[in-house]
């Protein structure tokens, strides 16, 4: 007799409302289940409000990082999804309201600053396999470039210099290995 897979994290679909008007989520925001790590690298693809998490997960992976002013959910899902699959119930059981001033994405500039911290934290985990590590590094390099471009546009020279140095170090370390990260 076969037993169904026991997932420790489950999430549902959601209805999006922006400024009081229902909107369709873009294709990149489509929810999924299974091994969604690579989708999680690109964006926060699980809404904490639509998820059920077995409490043992927090003992193993830690809590949401309250030191991050934003993107603490991105950080948590990365740490979890790097090692476990998730269940997805394709029913819109949540109404997600956006477009208001309380949204963290409107409150903080350069949200990629916090995603970079999450990616760097994930790279510290020795359990991360080589392929996922390389993909994480590629995403980190991409996020650094986004912030560099934004810093140049806003003439934040010291900020740009610091990030460019970090990006160059990553590219030098990982673009010259036997199995190099594709650096663009």
Task: Give each language-model segment a name.
Residues 25-118:
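Conserved nucleotide-sugar donor-binding catalytic segment
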Residues 3-4, 40, 123, 152:
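Hydrophobic residues in alpha-helical segments
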Residues 98-184:
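C-terminal subregions of glycosyltransferases and related glycan-biosynthesis enzymes
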Residues 1-24:
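Conserved donor NDP-sugar-binding/catalytic core segment of glycosyltransferases
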Residues 17, 22-23, 57, 97, ...:
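Generic alpha-helical hydrophobic packing signal
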